[in-house]
Amino acid sequence: MRQGGEGQCISAELPLMRQAMTRAQRPPAEEAPPLALGIPVHGRWTARNGPATKVPSHTHNLAQTYAIDLARRPAPEPVWLWPPARRPETYPSFGEPLLAPADGQVVTATDGQRDHLTRTSLAGLLYVLPEAFVRSIGLPRHLLGNHLILDLGDGAYAVLAHLRRRSLKVAVGDRVTAGQPLAECGNSGNSAEPHLHFQLMSGPDVTSAHGLRFTWRYQDGDGREHQGVPADNTCVVPVPNAPKDPPASYAP
């Protein structure tokens, strides 16, 4: 659970929830050089549940081996008793623009699921555990919520999940360019509070693809620049105009 302070944050997808979600574990694809991508947000965010801290960062299921979550800070402190839930609009992540991490084409676009109340209290925790199990036995979209899948070429596909309802600015078949606004951050699907779930994978179908590695260029809270993936509870500020590395091929 999150303690006070900007760098400390409650997990939006708790370990027990991830266990409930995991059915057939899928091993990652053969190691390939990580693909350099743009960070799909503006401003100051906090990383959590990322592969710099643990692999798999979430689970191998649904190609989440190297997935990462980003949340805007500061956010309301979690409370044990009251209020039992908050409206997603009270969180700074909610409604933030989400951007294309690279040039590509939209292959999946859904935004019809509602943005539910947050699950950051004791009552919310007791509710979200069985809810996560119910979601896990349904379709992947019940876990991902509203989401986009982008074909980045060379066998790499990016997923942006938990989008705000009715916020899509693109449709299936659209070509997008790096940095283009795609949608807004929301709280749909398996999400305790508004945040972005991002992952890279080897195919357009999360049930059969494998997770792939990626790197970002960013500054931490002290202004130091990094090329890689931020560790959990690290401040992430995208560095603009990052040089584009030659794309690595992930095709079998």
Protein language model annotation of sequence segments:
Residues 12-91:
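Non-catalytic extracellular/periplasmic "stalk"
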Residues 33-35, 58, 140, 168, ...:
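Acidic, glycine-rich catalytic/binding loops that coordinate metals and/or anionic ligands
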Residues 92-94, 143-144, 168-169:
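Short, small/polar residue-rich loop motifs at catalytic or cofactor-binding pockets
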Residues 98-108, 169-184:
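Short, well-structured beta-strand-loop connectors
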Residues 105-163:
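Zn2+-dependent peptidoglycan hydrolase active-site motif and core
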